[in-house]
């Protein structure tokens, strides 16, 4: 007799098969569709980060509760991603499962990953313009803009090894959150499954290359283009943020974090779970 108290959860092997089918489906989409989905994902990621910045803007950074609440708020971006079915670079690296199955070539995988990254960047750029012209930078006596500057500045002083490691741990959490969401039978199930892993990576200061594509370039724009009244309200100056340059962002943060994100998602989650659960399948 069937146990009526048993949970109706997907078996691990079945989750791996679901992830592999999703990977193949994403790769099979047209380039235009992939780019538009990626643009939406970039917007959603920027929305989540904006929520996070709005919460921490006037709160002491030493308070653990601030990091916890900020992390919970940031989860909104990933909830939108999951609900709307968009393509984020850090989760799209899991499509390497389709390559290991022989469905696609490395060239196809790389083109798809680059297309998604470009789409994410385009979406972030569009939303960043909206934020800039909305005047949010000057809100709360410029505290919101100051929060952006300090958040971005803090990301620019990691060593290469630290950035890669933080990137690995970040996308490990992101892809595990996605993997856990495959267990859900309802929308509520999927959302609840994602909350803690995403909150962990944000509260712990792990590095996400697409999220950084929003906050660091935005901080660079503030440093170079913010009007004098902003600096007066902030009681600071652009000279206090010397690390916020495009070249330093690319070399010290973007590239090593992106490498870490790829390792965390494609290797530690996607390939490992495929090797564990799907290797014996024909």
Q: Which stretches of residues belong to each language-model region?
A:
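Alpha-helical transmembrane segments and their helix-helix packing motifs
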Residues: 1-282
């Amino acid at each position: 007799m069937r146990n009526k108290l048993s949970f109706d959860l997907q078996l691990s092997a079945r989750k791996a098969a679901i992830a592999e089918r999703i990977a193949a489906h994403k790769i099979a989409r047209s380039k235009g569709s992939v780019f538009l989905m990626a643009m939406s994902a970039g917007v959603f990621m920027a929305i989540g980060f904006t929520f996070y910045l709005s919460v921490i803007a006037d709160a002491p950074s030493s308070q653990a509760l601030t990091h916890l609440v900020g992390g919970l708020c940031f989860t909104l971006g990933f909830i939108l991603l999951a609900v709307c079915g968009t393509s984020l670079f850090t989760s799209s690296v899991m499509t390497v499962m389709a390559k290991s199955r022989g469905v696609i070539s490395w060239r196809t995988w790389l083109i798809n990953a680059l297309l998604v990254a470009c789409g994410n960047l385009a979406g972030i750029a569009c939303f960043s313009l909206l934020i800039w012209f909305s005047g949010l930078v000057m809100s709360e006596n410029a505290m919101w803009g100051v929060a952006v500057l300090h958040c971005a500045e803090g990301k620019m002083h990691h060593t290469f090894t630290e950035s890669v490691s933080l990137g690995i741990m970040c996308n490990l959490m992101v892809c595990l959150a996605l993997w856990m969401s495959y267990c859900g039978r309802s929308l509520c199930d999927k959302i609840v499954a994602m909350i803690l892993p995403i909150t962990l990576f944000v509260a712990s200061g792990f590095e996400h290359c697409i999220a950084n594509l929003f906050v660091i370039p935005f901080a660079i724009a503030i440093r170079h283009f913010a009007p004098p009244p902003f600096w007066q309200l902030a009681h600071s100056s652009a000279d206090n943020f010397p690390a916020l340059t495009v070249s330093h962002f690319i070399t010290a943060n973007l590239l090593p974090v992106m490498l870490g994100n790829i390792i965390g998602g494609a290797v530690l989650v996607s390939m490992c779970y495929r090797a564990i659960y799907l290797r014996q399948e024909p």
